[in-house]
Swiss-Prot record:
Biological source species: Arabidopsis thaliana (Mouse-ear cress)
Pathway of action: Alkene biosynthesis; ethylene biosynthesis via S-adenosyl-L-methionine; ethylene from S-adenosyl-L-methionine: step 2/2
Top-level taxon of origin: Eukaryota
Binding site for 2-oxoglutarate: 245
Protein name: 1-aminocyclopropane-1-carboxylate oxidase 4
Gene behind the chain: ACO4
């Protein structure tokens, strides 16, 4: 099998720009995932985020997780469970309104650090969306405009730790799923593996590369590209050894009232395929309500369910201007 795509974004600024853009295009079309190096985010900042995130888990969350596992009987499993994940998490909201000042137990220095980190990830997310636009033949800013709706995109971070698990064959760190939203940027542990994606019917490891940012595409980009790019099923395996695995996933998603539909330009480019929309038109908030109930099920029935709701969305709605 071909190797997992690792993209050196620094090469976009030189003679290898065309080759690098082609690598991004291939990764989006054939993997739904790629890994970025030389992405412009300070390595010192990433080291500090990793250090303080692991310290926060040890200080504030480790004992709670152990108690929760014990209370649910997950420390003495005898058979496989498919309705729970072996992970400890908390969430930070950045857009349209930040909650980072309200999340309990965070040291002030950690709050400040994560605000800085979120700003850098937001900027990189928008830069990557424009690279996708370029490869798709869409005007610069098209995806960002679609994501804005009447307000701003929904942007937040899930901070996860996957502690050592005594029965990794019986419980996943995170069950297989596709991501509901737009573009997801992941800063993951470079010492402990575990993230896998499904490609051609086989589970493939996403290699932990120091200081890299893993990018994956969500369901909304599959719809907007009319299936040219696909969201891909992925999971996290539980581990028995070490200190556990850190994962910081930031989700740059459409605003709640954003109307999502295949880009007309991409339908036109599919002339040989009868110029038809293969995907529904819907309000992102409606999709999320459905997704929250069936996250760990196949995405195709979600798309079919949204098709049944299409009549509630005006047929002539286009991308709304940014604020």
């Amino acid at each position: 099998m071909e190797s997992f795509p690792i993209i050196n974004l620094e090469k976009l600024n030189g003679e290898e720009r065309a080759i690098t853009m082609e690598k991004i295009k291939d990764a989006c079309e054939n993997w739904g995932f790629f890994e970025c190096v030389n992405h412009g985010i300070s390595l010192e900042l990433l080291d500090k985020v990793e250090k303080m995130t692991k310290e926060h888990y040890k200080k504030c969350m480790e004992e709670r997780f152990k108690e929760s596992i014990k209370n649910r009987g997950l420390d003495s499993l005898r058979s496989e469970v498919n309705d729970v994940d072996w992970e400890s998490t908390f969430y930070l909201k950045h857009l349209p309104v930040s909650n980072i000042s309200d999340v309990p137990d965070l040291d002030d220095d950690y709050r400040t650090l994560m605000k800085d980190f979120a700003g850098k990830i937001e900027k990189l997310s928008e830069e990557l969306l424009d690279l996708l636009c370029e490869n798709l033949g869409l005007e610069k800013g098209y995806l960002k405009k679609v994501f804005y709706g009447s307000k701003r995109p929904t942007f937040g971070t899930k901070v996860s730790n996957y502690p050592p698990c005594p029965n990794p064959d019986l419980v996943k760190g995170l069950r297989a799923h596709t991501d509901a939203g737009g573009i997801i940027l992941l800063f993951q542990d470079d010492k402990v593996s575990g993230l896998q994606l499904l490609k051609d019917g086989e589970w493939v490891d996403v290699p932990p590369v120091k200081h890299s940012i893993v990018v994956n595409l969500g369901d909304q980009l599959e719809v907007i590209t009319n299936g040219k790019y696909k969201s891909v099923e992925h999971r996290v395996l539980s581990q028995t050894d070490g200190e556990g695995r850190m994962s910081i996933a930031s989700f740059y998603n459409p605003g709640s009232d954003s109307v999502i539909f295949p880009a007309p330009e991409l339908i036109g480019k599919e002339a040989e395929k009868e110029k038809k929309e293969n995907y529904p038109r819907f309000v992102f908030e409606d999709y999320m309500k459905l997704y929250s109930a069936v996250k760990f099920q196949a995405k195709e029935p979600r798309f079919e369910a949204m098709k049944a709701m299409e009549t509630t969305v005006a047929n002539n709605v286009g991308p709304l201007a940014t604020a």
